[in-house]
Amino acid sequence: PMVWFIDSAGARIDPQGALSGDNISLFAGSGHLFREEVIMSGVVPLVAAMVGPGAAGTAYIPGLADFVPMVRGQGSMALGGPPLVKAVTGQDISEQDLGGTRVHAEVSGVGDVEVADEATCIALIKDYLSFMPQHCEERPPVRTDVRDPVDRRDESLLDILPDSPRQAYDMYAIVKTIVDDGHILDLKPRWAKNIITCLARIGGYPIGIVANNPKGLGGVLDVNSADKAAHFMQICDAFGIPLVFLMDVPGFMVGSKVEHEGIIRH
């Protein structure tokens, strides 16, 4: 696996910087970095931890990664930082308002999880990689210390699911009931809340779960939820992680807003 810890404001563009005069050729090598990341994609797990800013070139790294945790108030990513945005568009905006942790966790969906500090970020990366093989030709690791029996019967499921199909319920409660020890790694939980994508285990075996969430837009599919589910399924497919679908969906969203967003392509 490849893990980046990103804390970079990008290349210097002042007269002494890498992009000045004859020095611009020195920065051209960054294209090779992006090429290698593309080649590695789907072959080994790619993690980009945003522990600081990632502007310009360093913003492409998380854009190509599989898993992007961000440290709250520290991490950010944008193709152009606030000074460049001001120079080009005239807009005054802070680093966090432009591409901070809340923005990418809730609005854009580029970030997967917003965490409190770097220690929590590292622990989360370890948890993510515990589900992953070392590379695509290796089987996902199986935990042998699981004591949660796979054949257990849980009557609480009958209480979670309502009798009426028009009544919302907690899909997370169902997911946690059927997996080992109730532990899940929820990916992009604050973006496209109408669908849940998470990693978990059953009998020690890693699985990916895709579940419609009745508490988010009634579980209906829209552009963002389709993108979220598709990206997650591609990662699971690349690394041999079985998928479990919990389906309760009224269909695709309709209306001018989603048509203008290109829902037919999704």
Which functions belong to the PLM regions below?
Residues 6-137, 241, 249-266:
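Conserved catalytic cores of soluble enzyme domains
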Residues 86-93, 109-116, 160-169, 214-221:
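Short, exposed beta-strand "edge-strand" segments with a Pro/Gly-rich flavor and a Y/T-containing core
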